[in-house]
Amino acid sequence: MPITKIHARQIYDSRGNPTVEVDLFTEKGVFRAAVPSGASTGVHEALELRDGDKAVHLGKGVLKAVSNINEKIAPALIAKGFDVTAQKDIDDFMMALDGSENKGNLGANAILGVSLAVAKAGAVHKGLPLYKYIAELAGTGKVVLPVPAFNVINGGSHAGNKLAMQEFMILPVGASSFAEAMRMGSEVYHHLKAEIKKRYGLDATAVGDEGGFAPNIQDNKEGLDLLNTAIDKAGYTGKISIGMDVAASEFFKDGKYDLDFKNPASDSSKWLSGEQLTELYQSFIKEYPVVSIEDAFDQDDWDNWGKFHGATSIQLVGDDLTVTNPKRIQTAIDKKSCNCLLLKVNQIGSVTESIEAAKLSRANGWGVMVSHRSGETEDTFIADLVVGLATGQIKTGAPCRSERLAKYNQLLRIEEELGADAVYAGHNFRNPQV
């Protein structure tokens, strides 16, 4: 069934910045998708097209991307008469229409908006829930409910505190279902709030971009200690593991790592070498139930990535390192730099390429963690994506803020719909199909 109309508009994300929304029309109705955007972005990401007029939205308007959809992509796609279920053909056509390596002409945010809407329409035309349609597109065997990695303490570029490392996450690996994982996450979150209030005062319980708390602490171990205490008070010691997103590219300076990077008068004699930072991570792993570290080093510090990967058995996630880009992923595979892909649909800019990135990673023994961005919308596509790709893990913020809960609540609905067929990844989150 062909696409009859495509209309894009500028809406706002969870940080109050403009973003792209697309309505795609077929005989069966209207299918809507909204595009997220990140705060800490890798230099190798596909290009998010912004207007650049500093007098309007501080340069962050997306009317160029909207116009590219309405005036270029829409007429070209409709003229071709593609069936809405031809996801790969449509995505390939849009990439050819753009003609650049990084989607810089039309904008990755323009192409992705249409790509997401096409997938939603394709599912309805096939008479399938979106997660089952994605599983069909990807050739997935059995669908799997993911372990949620709740980002409950925010630092780095996501918060105004002194904490250098960006995300401190809890993973309810010992839950028996996604619903139980949500309960665990929610309870720990509330115990954490009470503990932060007790230690640092009520004003320390304000939340960051992704719903996590941002107490004004500087020592990263203090963050881990807070998590351990909250997990213990909730009664889940041994059932909940810890994950971190260090976002080290944000504080990489002159070949070293500055854990006081938010201080303009930071003492360069205290900056850490890659080796010293590795030692710090090893101490985290030894002292706390840390099972996953993301972006442990700068996005081009291949040497330290490789050394750490060779010296640890935990999950090492590439985000800024790999930017969901098959070429970067292949380089990381060849260099043995990490063992898990952070999959962000807007880093690569289409559904087809997202599926291909996940398949390439899995074929080489990696895990895959599906991820939101810090600037999110109420769109729930990634909830269906993580189930359809059966990757076993998702991070989409704390159990707080509606744009985060929208995804978690969709996962609850999917688990309910699957009934007795629902499988929760649990301890097998790194390789749920084994």
From Swiss-Prot:
EC number: 4.2.1.11
Free-text cofactor note: Mg(2+) is required for catalysis and for stabilizing the dimer.
Subcellular location: Cytoplasm
One GO cellular component term: phosphopyruvate hydratase complex
Residues at which substrate binds: 158, 167, 294, 319, 371-374, 395
Residues that coordinate or bind Mg(2+): 245, 294, 319
Pathway: Carbohydrate degradation; glycolysis; pyruvate from D-glyceraldehyde 3-phosphate: step 4/5
Stored SUPFAM superfamilies: Enolase C-terminal domain-like, Enolase N-terminal domain-like
Subunit structure: Homodimer.
Protein name: Enolase
Organism: Caenorhabditis elegans
Lineage: Eukaryota, Metazoa, Ecdysozoa, Nematoda, Chromadorea
Gene that specifies this protein: enol-1
